[in-house]
Amino acid sequence: KDILGILLLMLFLMLLVLFAPDLLGDPDNYTPANPLSTPPHIKPEWYFLFAYAILRSIPNKLGGVLALVSSILILILMPFLHTSKQRSMMFRPFSQCLFWILVADLLTLTWIGGQPVEYPFIIIGQLASILYFFIILVLMPITSTIENNLLKW
């Protein structure tokens, strides 16, 4: 039974690739390219759109690249920034609230990264980028300190 399903799936994929390769493609890929500017439909994969939005939110190229790199590196450094004595978030309502705000901010940045560079999206991207760094670098350590002090009671 399993081999039959795998063979049917492989047959379907082979038919798709060999007889209709453009069926799942983006029609924007067939427009003539301007070598002086990046086409608007060119964007990174969905899991890097939040970093792309942070890159575009800073007008300076070097500043944007530094913000992009730091936005990814900060995710690697987050376990080291965690200074709370209690490891679980079950009994830490401030951290839970902060976590869900960060998730909403990351979803907003991901959405903005896929939008064109126009007026309302630029401002939203800049505010969401500031909030991203503010939550991770300022609010999370302060929240951990407050919750550590509450544990002493």
Swiss-Prot record:
SUPFAM superfamilies: a domain/subunit of cytochrome bc1 complex (Ubiquinol-cytochrome c reductase) (SSF81648). CDD domains: cytochrome_b_C. The keyword Ion transport does not apply. It holds the Pfam family Cytochrom_B_C. One of its GO terms (biological process) is mitochondrial electron transport, ubiquinol to cytochrome c. Component of the ubiquinol-cytochrome c reductase complex (complex III or cytochrome b-c1 complex) that is part of the mitochondrial respiratory chain. The b-c1 complex mediates electron transfer from ubiquinol to cytochrome c. Contributes to the generation of a proton gradient across the mitochondrial membrane that is then used for ATP synthesis. This is Cytochrome b. It comes from Cervus nippon taiouanus (Formosan sika deer). The gene is MT-CYB.
